[in-house]
Amino acid sequence: MSKSTAEIRQAFLDFFHSKGHQVVSSSSLVPNNDPTLLFTNAGMNQFKDVFLGLDKRAYSRATTSQRCVRAGGKHNDLENVGYTARHHTFFEMLGNFSFGDYFKHDAINFAWELLTSEQWFNLPKEKLWVTVYETDDEAYNIWANEVGVPHERIIRIGDNKGGAFASDNFWQMGDTGPCGPCSEIFFDHGDHIWGGPPGSAEEDGDRYIEIWNIVFMQFNRQSDGTMLPLPKPSVDTGMGLERIAAVLQHVNSNYEIDLFRDLIAAVADVTGATDLSSKSLRVIADHIRSCAFLISDGVIPSNENRGYVLRRIIRRAIRHGNMLGAKETFFYKLVAPLIAVMGPAAAELKQQQAMVEQVLKTEEEQFARTLERGLALLDDELSKLTGDTLDGETAFRLYDTYGFPVDLTADVCRERNLKVDEAGFEQAMEAQRRRARESSGFGADYNSLIRVDSASQFSGYDHVQQHATVTALFRNGEAVDEIHAGEEAVVVLNRTPFYGESGGQVGDKGELKNATATFSVTDTQKYGQAIGHVGILTTGTLRVNHSVEALVDVVRRNRIRLNHSATHLLHAALRNVLGEHVAQKGSLVNDKYLRFDFSHFEAMKPEQIRLVEDLVNEQIRRNMPVQTEVMELDAAKEKGAMALFGEKYDDQVRVLTMGDFSTELCGGTHASRTGDIGLFRILTESGTAAGIRRIEAVTGEGAIALLHQQSDLLQDVAHLVKGDIHNLADKVRAVLDRSKMLERELQQLKDQQAAQESASLSSSAKLINGVKLLVSQLDNVEPKMLRTMVDDLKNQLGSAIIVLATTTDDKVSLIVGVTKDLTGKVKAGELIADIAQQVGGKGGGRPDMAQAGGTDVQALPAALASVEAWVASRM
C-alpha cells in the first residue's frame, strides 16, 4: 500500500470507527487543566482524567489523530530536529483507546489486522517484530498463539532502566497512578540498513523502527510502589503518523514522505535555496508545523513558558533561513503551503491563517534586527575560544541581550564541532530567575494542590439558592473533617448553585449557612468534577456531612450574566466588522466589566470600534431571546457554533444562541434576553501581543455610570471655559487659538531676551592664541534658548568658540558652538564631553555644535574654568 499521509490518517480513523470507536477530534496543543504539561505530547493527554476516573465519556472506545509538540520540558526533541531521520517538534499521534472496554486480546488483534490486512495497510508480516514486558505472558501468548508471530520475532524486555518496572516496555503516568506493561511493534527496513532488533546492542540503529506502542493500563501504582489491579483495565495506543507514512511510502526518513517533500520544496522556494539536501530545509519544514499550530491554538511568542518555547522554535527557523541565504522575511510565507499539505487536519489553522502569518512575520521582523549583531558577537567569541566549549556566561549574554535561545547558540557551535556550557548557562539563568522571584513576592497557593474525588451537581442555571450537603473540606490544601470560625478553607458540596470559574467567567460569591455556622464564599473554583467554595468561616463550626443553604450573591451574579452575554455579541460583531479570521483568544467576565482578547493583526480604527459598539447595541435593542440547547459536540460544530479558546468540552455540549446573530458553545450563566444587557460601551482597545488585540467594555449599570461620568466631565470642562455643553467645542477651540497666540508672543519675547543677552555677552569674549573664546554661566535662561543664543553669538563674533551653561532644578545644561573655520582644531563634541564628565553627565553632537547635561551643579564653575586651558592646549 502506498498512500498519501492524509489518506493514511483517514484510513486509521476509518478502521477503528468500523470497530465501534468514536472518532474524537484532536485536542489543543495547549493542555486543558493540566499544569504539569507544557504541550500536548501524546494522544492520551485529552483522556487523562478519564483514565484517572475523574471524568466520564459517553463512549468507551475512541480513536484520534492528535497534534503533538515535543520541544521544551521532559520531552524535548528540538536540538535533534533536522539532524536525524525521525525527530520532530510537531507530529501527529494516531491512537485508539479503550476505557474499561476491550483489553489485550482485542488491542493486539486490531493492530495486527490494520497493519497486515490487504484491505488496510498490507505490510509484510515477516517484516514486523514485537516486544512485550518480560513478565507479561498474556500478551506474549496472544502474539504467539493467536496472531501467529514466530517466537524469534517476539522479544521480552525487562527492567532496563535501573529499577523495578523501569523499562521501555512498562508505561506509567507518574510516580503513582495508572500504569502497566506495553507491547511495541517494530518494522524491519532490511539488512541494507545498519541496526539490530530491540533489546540488542545495535538497537539504536535505523533498521528496526518502532511504529506502534500499545499500553495496557492494568495497575494503580501506590506511593509505596505496590501495584494494585485496576477494576477496569484500559488501553492506550500511539502510532506516529509520520513514521507509518515513511514505512508505507517505502522511504527510510520521515523527511522523505510526501508531506515533507512538498514542504521542503516550499521552503526552498521562499528562501532561494538550491541545495535540496540541506539540513536547514528540514529544520524549517518541521518548525513551520509546530509554530503555525501553536499560534493557532493560542500560544503567542514571549519570554515565558509556552510562549518562550514557541519563540525559540521560530528563531531557530529564522536562523536556518539566514544560513540558506534568505534576504527577507520568509517564514510566514510557509503557512499557506502547510495548510495545503495538511488537508482536513488544518481546517482550524486555515480559519486563522491571516493571524498566524502576521504573528510569524512580526516575530521575524523583530528578531532580524538583532540576529546579525548577535551572530557577529558569537563569531567574535568563538574566534577567541581556546578550548571546545563556549562558556555559559557568553551564551546567557546572547540570550539576554540579543534574544538568542541557548539551543540556537548550540546549533551554531555544533556546526563548528564545539559545545556550549549549558550548566553555566543554567546557573546564569537561575540567578536571573532568583532575582525575579525575590522581587515578585508570590506566595504558595495551597488551593491549587487540592484533588477532589467526589463530584458536585451544578444547579446554577435555574437556581441561586440550594439546600446541599458538605462532602469535603480543605484547609491549606489538606482534607479535614471540620473547620472553625476564622479559618480559610474550601468547601465542597454535593450540589450547588455557585458557578465555578471557567470559560473566562469568574466564580460566584455568596454564603453557605446553617443554624450554627456561616461560611463567606469569596470565590468558586472547579476541582475536576467537584465545585469548591473558597472563603472563610465567619461563625460557628462546619463539618463534613453538615447540611447548608447555599446562597449566591444575586446582584453580583446578574451583572456577570449581562457581561458574559455581551462578550458573545461582541465576538459576533467583531467577526462581522473585521472578518472571519477573528477568534477568541481569552476573556475575563466579572461583575464590573468584561475583557475580550481576539486574533487581529492591527489596531482597530476608531470608526471600526464605533461600528462594533453600534452593532452590539443594535442586537441589544432587538431584545432577542438567549436560548440554550444541549447537543452532541459534532452536531454543534455543524450548526456553526464557535468554541471557546482553551476550553475542554464534553461530548454533550451546551449551545448558546442569540437569535440569528450569535451561536457559541458555552457553559456560563447568561441573560434571558439580549435586552436585559441594556447598554454596551467600549472602554479601550489595545494590543497584548503580536496578532492579539484586547477590548474592555462595560454593560448595563456600568455603561450608564460611564455615561454619567463622561457627562459630568463635559459639564466641568464647559464651566472652566465659561460655556455649556452645546457650544463646548467652539469654546475649547477659542481657548486653544488664544493659547497658541500667547505662546507665539511669549516666544517672541524670549527671542528678544536671548538676542539682548547675546549682545551683552559678545563683549566678554577672550582671545586665546588669537582665537575668540566665550564661556558663560547664565541665570534665568531656559535650556532650549541656549542654541538660539549660540547661533546669534556666532554671527556677532564671526570666528569663535562658545560655551554656555545654565542650571534648572539641580540639573546642568551645556552647549558648545564652534564656527566652521575652527572645527579642524577644536571639535564641539570633544570639548563638551570633557566638560560634561566633570559635572556628572555626558553628551555629544556635531563638530560645530554639541549639547550635554549633568547632575552636579556645584561642580559647574570649576568645569567652565577648565575650558580655557583645554582650548589653549589645542590651538
UniProtKB/Swiss-Prot annotation:
GO molecular function, one term: tRNA binding
Keyword Nucleotide-binding in annotation: yes
SUPFAM superfamilies tied to this protein: Class II aaRS and biotin synthetases (SSF55681), Putative anticodon-binding domain of alanyl-tRNA synthetase (AlaRS) (SSF101353), ThrRS/AlaRS common domain (SSF55186), Translation proteins (SSF50447)
Cofactor note: Binds 1 zinc ion per subunit.
Keyword field: Aminoacyl-tRNA synthetase, ATP-binding, Cytoplasm, Ligase, Metal-binding, Nucleotide-binding, Protein biosynthesis, RNA-binding, tRNA-binding, Zinc
Gene3D superfamilies named in the record: 2.40.30.130, 3.10.310.40, 3.30.54.20, 6.10.250.550, Bira Bifunctional Protein, Domain 2 (3.30.930.10), Threonyl-trna Synthetase, Chain A, domain 2 (3.30.980.10)
Reaction(s) catalysed by this chain's protein: tRNA(Ala) + L-alanine + ATP = L-alanyl-tRNA(Ala) + AMP + diphosphate
EC nos: 6.1.1.7
Cofactor dependence: Zn(2+)
Name of the protein described by the UniProt record: Alanine--tRNA ligase
Biological source species: Yersinia pseudotuberculosis serotype O:1b (strain IP 31758)
